[in-house]
């Protein structure tokens, strides 16, 4: 009888042990993906209780024992984790040990001012801490930035500034010869104007060519976005540019100042920066909208005047009143020489 009991006990222990280890790979109970945030310095017991409470494992104790038996307890890392539906204990353990937290993202569009970017960072609910002062205009690189929950706002802004520095350092030495600017900062200033002049990627380099040619010939840039920045620091003007604003003496108004304005008017993207560092060859000095969403370029004032007339004719077919939200488009003026 004792032998039978011993045999049964042994079979029971073996069965329990088999169940214990086989259960490691069984599908879990979660019907859908769950997000679990493990705070730093959380005990292993609390972690498994949290996972059971979230419904990702059936019971806390078996999972805790599994982790301890396999020597994985000390390797569990704090973080924010996405646990797939029906993930096994083995799969969940691999996620917790990997430390690969959920990657959140913040996309900074080309052409935003530093204050606009700063406000985006301040409003992001995943980031923590104070954003600090508004970064200097034009020092941030538009990009999609990935970060984990708990990253500080100040650190992300610093990362954006470092990204621009790295990009400029990588491309400044390969710039075209004979450009009418001598520092990376001046390149950023011109690139910011190019960025605000067009949303069309295939026009950026051509517009950069026009502005580079104008600077080389001592012609004023006469860029409408510089007027707007001087008045609103990049926010919408709310009306078409008026003659008084066109003639207004702000430091950024390139209709009245020679050369580049004192600083960028936005944060230019990589394409705009590359466009001013390596503009395509050509002699164009003017551009005007074609009324169909693109621009017409010209090397002579006569050709430019024909393009302006064509634009105005197109606008008359659309509406009896020519819109004046862009002086460059609606009432182009002849560039003035120094």
Across the structure, where does each feature detected by a protein language model lie?
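N-terminal start-of-chain detector that recognizes signal peptides
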Residues: 6-10, 54-55, 78-80, 256-261, ...
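N-terminal hydrophobic or amphipathic segments with adjacent small-residue motifs
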Residues: 9-12, 35, 287
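Bacterial extracytoplasmic/cell-wall-associated proteins, especially those involved in peptidoglycan
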Residues: 43, 119-128, 133, 138-338
């Amino acid at each position: 009888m004792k032998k039978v009991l011993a045999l049964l006990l042994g079979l029971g222990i073996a069965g329990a042990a088999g169940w214990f280890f086989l259960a490691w790979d069984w599908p879990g109970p979660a019907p859908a993906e769950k997000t679990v945030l493990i705070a730093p310095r959380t005990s292993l017991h609390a972690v498994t209780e949290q996972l059971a409470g979230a419904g990702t494992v059936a019971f806390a104790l078996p999972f805790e024992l599994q982790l301890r038996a396999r020597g994985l307890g000390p390797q569990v890392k704090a973080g924010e984790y996405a646990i797939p539906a029906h993930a096994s204990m083995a799969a969940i353990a691999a996620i917790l040990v990997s430390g690969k937290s959920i990657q959140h993202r913040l996309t900074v569009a080309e052409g935003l001012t530093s204050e606009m970017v700063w406000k985006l960072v301040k409003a992001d609910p995943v980031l923590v801490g104070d954003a600090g002062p508004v970064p200097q205009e034009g020092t941030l690189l538009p990009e999609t930035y990935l970060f984990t929950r708990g990253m500080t706002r100040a650190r992300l802004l610093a990362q954006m500034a470092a990204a621009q520095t790295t990009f400029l350092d990588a491309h400044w030495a390969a710039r075209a010869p004979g450009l009418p600017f001598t520092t990376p900062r001046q390149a950023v200033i011109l690139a910011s104007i190019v960025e605000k002049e067009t949303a069309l990627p295939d026009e950026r380099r051509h517009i950069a060519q026009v502005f580079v040619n104008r600077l080389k010939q001592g012609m004023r840039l006469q860029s409408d976005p510089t007027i707007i920045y001087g008045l609103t620091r990049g926010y919408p003007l709310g009306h078409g540019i008026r003659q008084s604003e066109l003639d207004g003496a702000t430091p950024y108004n390139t209709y009245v100042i020679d050369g580049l304005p004192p600083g960028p008017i936005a944060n230019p993207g990589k394409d705009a920066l590359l466009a001013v560092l390596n503009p395509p060859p050509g002699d164009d000095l003017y551009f005007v909208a074609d009324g169909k969403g693109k621009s017409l370029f010209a090397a002579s004032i006569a050709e430019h005047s024909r393009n302006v007339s064509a634009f105005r004719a197109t606008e008359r077919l659309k509406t009896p009143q020519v819109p004046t939200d862009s002086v460059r488009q609606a009432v182009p003026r002849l560039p003035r020489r120094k």
